[in-house]
Amino acid sequence: MQITDVKIRKVATEGRMKALASITLDHEFVVHDLRIIEGSSGLFVAMPSKRTPEGIFRDIAHPINGEMRQKVEAAVLETYSNMDVEILDPQHVSYGTHE
């Protein structure tokens, strides 16, 4: 399975979340709302999740092996790092792509 496209939407908010991403797999399947987060060890990609009635966050979609997780994270973070648009106001959304 190949990641055939990555779209990044930078967010203009304070805090650890830097951007949202969508990935396309094999030109056929899209996963939205991956989050690029600034952690204590640098940037990482969090999978889309939903809060349960008990208050626990559960992934909606996620890789089932480490190799695919590394592919997703590498593609998303590479696209994010190559973006050169500075966000000046919360209404501005920028897109980056990866192919």
From Swiss-Prot:
Function: Could be involved in septation.
Name listed for the protein in its UniProt record: Putative septation protein SpoVG
SUPFAM superfamilies (alphabetical): SpoVG-like
Alphabetically ordered keywords of this record: Cell cycle, Cell division, Septation
Species whose genome carries this gene: Exiguobacterium sp. (strain ATCC BAA-1283 / AT1b)
NCBIfam families (UniProt xref): PRK13259.1 (NF009749)
Record GO biological process: division septum assembly; sporulation resulting in formation of a cellular spore
Keyword Cell division: yes
Signal sequence range: none
InterPro entries noted in UniProt: SpoVG, SpoVG_sf
UniProt family annotation: Belongs to the SpoVG family.
Cell division among keywords: yes
Gene3D superfamilies, sorted: Stage V sporulation protein G (3.30.1120.40)
Pfam families named among the record's database cross-references: SpoVG
PANTHER family: SEPTATION PROTEIN SPOVG-RELATED
